[in-house]
A protein has these predicted regions:
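Flexible glycine/proline-rich, aromatic-decorated loop/lid segments
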Residues: 125, 381-415
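Long, well-ordered, tryptophan-enriched scaffold segments
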Residues: 111-113, 122-214
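N-terminal export/assembly segments and adjacent metallocofactor-ligating motifs
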Residues: 1-158, 294, 346, 438, ...
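Glycine-rich phosphate/diphosphate-binding loops that line cofactor/substrate pockets in enzymes
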Residues: 1-9, 73-83, 184, 204-218, ...
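Short beta-alpha connecting loops at secondary-structure transitions
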Residues: 130-136, 402, 411-422
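Extended redox/cofactor-interaction regions of prokaryotic respiratory oxidoreductases
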Residues: 23-119, 143-147, 239-384, 394-398, ...
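Phosphate/diphosphate-binding loops
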Residues: 370-371, 377, 417-437, 629
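Long, contiguous, secondary-structure-rich segments that constitute the structural scaffold
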Residues: 228, 429-489, 585, 589-611, ...
Length: 732
């Protein structure tokens, strides 16, 4: 009432527990809509940045910009000779979507005699198990490698000219760039070698083998390939390479190992097609991914909190929006609306999962921000800066339902029974908001019609049981079994279609007849030169209409050839974590016993591992178990040294997601939360994506006794090596 509804920022996204009735993604949004609205945090396509901002304009695939991969498991088994796991770790980033199926598939492909090649700076957990060959590349330099491959194909006549002529537009622009471009520098393997760290002979061998054998590229999410500076360039360059070898022909496609059937879309599953696709939206008691005019992209939240003048950007940025949406400009605040004064969040993981986390911690202490309300099952990260934390019940403490239609195993609707009573005062997210509604109704409902019957209007009179039944009756499961039978059995399953082997795989229809089966681009073809980008951003020198080589610029200096590298000589790889889901499970005692999960320092503190190549460790005088600072001009965090040949020289590796343990909030951290020192800048000038991997850092050996004397308050906090810092350090 003091500032207006737009003054409340709602943070309502993230990777939470699987809940439909008691969801953890914006249960408060509807309540605030009943009271006039709020400003939403719009989560940009953080797992798909390069694809969304780049490849989507090349092959038009909606909504994420990744390739069609329907029925590809069958096609690969029959036709593919080589799989390129490019920046892909399908042993780590499957998480709740894929379970063990991606791992089993990779073993199956090997058993079928298919060659597997891993391209990544690190010998990750998938490459260590499945790859026949590892090609280590410097982080965020895949673009140089890709251009050099294209150079070999063009100069040695190793690409499909007929396909390029009939299925693409703008190839002459790519050829111009490969053969010299504006700076007259041919993108030869010898040119690429010092940039990407891959020997010229290896580049040539890879290019020739790819041209000779049916090849499919493979991906999961995360890593420097798709979440770094100008990630739209390697993403759309990969599409160009696939096109040069006849994208869609048997064995030549793009496969993704996770998020199958995402958004109930059968184009995005390499597994046998199901008769129906389950949905859980009918009884979903939280926010939906849709467009609104009152929002801020998640990557711009620090700027939005601290704003004193309007800020602008392009697109709603949420992952379900079509490519055309990226051409529309928005601003915060809207004309005549307030700036931010309050945050209500169920997503307290911004600081350790997004770009420029230190900037966010500074913003949380802006004088204009009056109040931060947080609800969450776990006390992590941003919770340190909340005024009130509402304890949320976990999945095991409530009755709910769930859908498994992304694992590729069985399309299943599940009844999730309550396992235990809620601990202490914990309530579900939905119930927490109901309690707020009750209080508001009690305080204001008698005299103000806005608050009258607020609880009833918020819940629509639904109970847990009626919400489950409503969800079931609109899920497609009701076509196969009754609600009563579902409750008795605890699940309902959707069968595969008969003769699923006959389904055309990937881009085969487009390959066979591009005129009859056009792509959703303006021309209907693969647009190596994007007409949409040319029309809407003719002066954008970072994301041009066609792929171009770009490295150090006024915007980014995160490259080894930049003068900044003299001070900060190592490129940091920060992937999705092997032993966590983002920040979740960072306090798991059993996982912390694994040597690549935590490194116990001389002070007994469990530090986040920093993988360092033996060559670099020798140069720095480091040994296993030493404690180091990971530092750049945005601040520093810490880590425990883990010396291994599994990381390329001049590169260091530290997973993202360690729970922050601030030394000086907004400047330094003990726990290894390296997103704090990631660039605050977005993917490029007109692309509000995150840059959270592939940036420059320095490594400094630390004497833990001396640093404890320097920062006595931070280093005197109580902690348990098998859990982390004690909650008593923070809760009042």
């Amino acid at each position: 009432e003091v500032y207006g509804a737009g003054s409340i920022l709602v943070q309502q996204d993230g990777h939470g527990e699987t809940k439909i009735v008691h969801p953890c993604h914006g249960a408060m949004v509807k309540l605030l809509e009943l009271l006039g609205g709020s400003t939403l945090q719009a989560r940009q396509p953080d797992s798909w940045e390069g694809w969304y901002w780049g490849a989507k304009h090349t092959w038009g695939t909606e909504p994420l910009g990744q390739g069609y991969d329907q029925n590809l498991t069958y096609d690969i088994t029959k036709n593919t000779k080589m799989l390129l796991y490019w920046g892909c770790d399908n042993e780590t980033t499957t998480w709740g979507w894929g379970g063990q199926m991606p791992s089993r598939l990779s073993f199956w492909f090997t058993d079928c005699g298919i060659t597997s090649v891993a391209i990544a700076p690190d010998l990750n957990y998938s490459a260590a198990v499945h790859a026949d060959k590892w090609i280590p590349v410097y982080p965020n330099t895949d673009l140089a490698l890709q251009f050099a491959i294209a150079y070999v194909w063009i100069t040695e006549d190793l690409y499909d000219k007929e396909y390029i002529a009939t299925h693409t537009i703008g190839f002459d622009w790519l050829e111009y760039e490969v053969m010299g471009g504006a700076n007259s520098t041919p993108k030869t393997p010898e040119w690429a070698e010092p940039l990407c760290g891959v020997p010229a002979r290896t580049i040539k061998a890879l290019a020739r083998k790819w041209a000779k054998e049916a090849t499919t590229t493979c991906h999961c999410n995360g890593g420097s390939y798709i979440r770094s500076c100008y990630a739209h360039e390697p993403a759309r360059m990969e599409v160009c390479l696939l096109a040069m070898q006849g994208l869609g022909k048997p064995g030549c496609n793009f496969m993704k190992f996770i998020e199958w059937n995402i958004y109930e879309n059968p184009n995005y599953s390499p597994m046998p097609r199901d008769e129906a696709y389950l949905t859980g939206w009918a009884g979903y008691n939280a926010a939906f991914l849709d467009s609104t005019d009152r929002f801020i992209p998640k990557t711009l939240i620090p700027e939005g909190i601290a704003a004193k003048e309007p800020i602008t950007w392009y697109g709603h940025v949420i992952c379900m929006m079509p490519a055309e949406d990226q051409m529309e400009q928005f601003q915060f605040p809207l004309e005549g609306e307030p700036y931010l004064h309050m945050i209500w969040s169920d997503t307290p993981c911004w600081s350790t999962c997004w770009n420029g986390g230190n900037e966010y911690l500074k913003a949380l202490r802006c004088e204009n921000l009056d109040f931060v309300l947080l609800q969450h099952p776990w006390y992590e990260n941003d919770a340190h800066f909340a005024d009130i934390v509402l304890p949320v019940a976990t999945r095991f403490e409530v009755e709910d339902c769930a859908i498994d239609n992304q694992s590729g195993i069985v399309n299943t609707f599940l009844h999730c029974e309550q396992c235990v009573e809620p601990v202490g005062e914990a309530k579900s997210d939905w119930e927490c908001v109901q309690e707020v509604a009750k209080k508001l109704e009690k305080l204001y409902g008698v005299d103000d019609g806005l608050y009258t019957n607020l609880l009833e209007r918020y819940t629509d009179g639904r109970t847990v049981e009626s919400s489950i039944e409503l969800t079931f009756n609109n899920s497609s499961a009701q076509l196969y079994t009754s609600y009563e039978e579902f409750k008795e059995k605890g699940y309902a399953m959707i069968p595969h279609v008969e003769n699923w082997q006959e389904d055309h795989a990937g881009f085969f229809d487009f390959y066979s007849d591009p005129d009859a089966n056009p792509l959703p681009t303006p021309s209907g073809k693969i647009e190596i030169y994007s007409t949409r980008l040319a029309d809407n951003f003719p002066d954008d020198e970072e994301r041009m209409p066609y792929p171009h080589y770009i490295a150090a610029t006024d915007r980014f200096h995160e490259y080894r050839e930049d003068p900044k590298a003299e001070k900060y000589p190592y490129l940091l790889v920060s992937n999705h974590p092997r032993w966590r889901v983002h920040a979740n499970f960072d306090d798991n005692a059993w996982l912390r016993e694994i040597e690549t999960c935590k490194v116990i320092g001389p002070d007994g503190y469990a530090y986040e591992p920093v993988w360092i190549n033996p060559v670099d460790a020798t140069d720095m005088g480091l040994e296993n178990g030493d404690v180091v600072k990971v530092v750049n001009d945005r601040g520093w965090t810490m880590g425990g040294v883990y010396i291994t040949e599994r990381i390329k020289p001049h590169v260091v590796y530290q997973d993202h997601g360690a729970r922050i343990d601030p030394v000086i909030p907004g400047e330094s951290d003990r726990a290894g939360a390296n997103n704090l020192i990631a660039p605050k800048e977005t993917t490029s000038a007109n692309c509000a994506g995150e840059v959270t991997s592939g940036f420059l850092v320095g490594i400094e050996k630390v004497d833990v006794d001396e640093i404890a004397k320097q920062y006595p308050e931070a280093f005197s906090r109580s902690f348990q090596a098998d859990e982390g810092p004690d909650l008593a350090n923070w809760l009042v």
